[in-house]
Design a protein with these regions (language model features):
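Alpha-helical transmembrane segments and adjacent TM-loop junctions that form the membrane-embedded core
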Residues: 2-19, 42, 48, 56-199
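The first (N-terminal) embedded transmembrane alpha-helix
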Residues: 20-30
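Short, hydrophobic transmembrane alpha-helix segments
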Residues: 33-44
Length: 199
């Protein structure tokens, strides 16, 4: 009976992860489109950060499934080491994304362009809602898995980044401060790198 309960709990956890992956992937595409249409680099930066969140959730799901396999003749310690490998892959992804964002932001300093503030605010607002929902989906599972905890923390940090993008979009609307978009991009990139190196 306990085994059946554990199996049902794991199945519910997998479904939550799949749902979180789905909404993060759709959100990433929406942010990229919104960033291109509005000219906002910080929105694209947030999209790339969101993409790393989706990747971490995919890795967490795969690690959960592999981790449930018992030891065999080839894997004497079982498959649970897959979580450690998954966490390492996620770390490398964060660092690559962070460096790319810095490169793009520096280029924007030398070639600034106008940005459509309303598009930035609306898309980032939707992103914030999705980030909060995704974080709630993974919160309970994060207590029992370092890999899912990492994915949960990524969603929380992405929600904070979305708040920053909303603020930048508002400043662009009110004062035409286009430079706030570039500065925020550097801040997001810096945080992504710090998050990667401190994991």
């Amino acid at each position: 009976m306990a085994h059946e309960h554990n199996h049902n709990t794991e199945a519910i956890g997998d479904k939550r992860l799949i749902a979180a992956i789905g909404v993060n992937t759709v959100l990433t595409l929406a942010q990229v489109v919104g960033g291109i249409l509005s000219g906002s680099l910080s929105l694209i930066a947030d999209a790339l950060h969101n993409l790393s969140d989706a990747a971490s959730l995919v890795i967490a799901l795969i690690a959960r499934k592999i981790g449930r396999k018992p030891p065999d003749a080839f894997k004497t310690f079982g498959y649970r080491r897959s979580e450690t490998i998954a966490a390492l892959i996620n770390l490398v992804t964060l660092i690559i994304v962070g460096l790319y964002l810095i490169y793009e932001a520096i280029g924007r300093f030398f070639a600034p362009q106008p940005i459509e503030g309303w598009t930035v605010v609306v898309v980032a607002g939707i992103a914030l809602i999705v980030d909060v929902v995704t974080a709630l989906l993974t919160y309970t599972m994060s207590k029992n898995s370092m890999n899912i905890k990492a994915a949960f923390l990524h969603n929380v940090s992405d929600a904070l980044a979305s708040v920053g993008v909303i603020i930048a979009g508002t400043l662009i609307l009110l004062y035409d401060w286009y430079w706030t978009d570039t500065v925020l991009t550097l801040m997001i990139a810096g945080y992504v790198l710090w998050q990667g190196f401190s994991t």
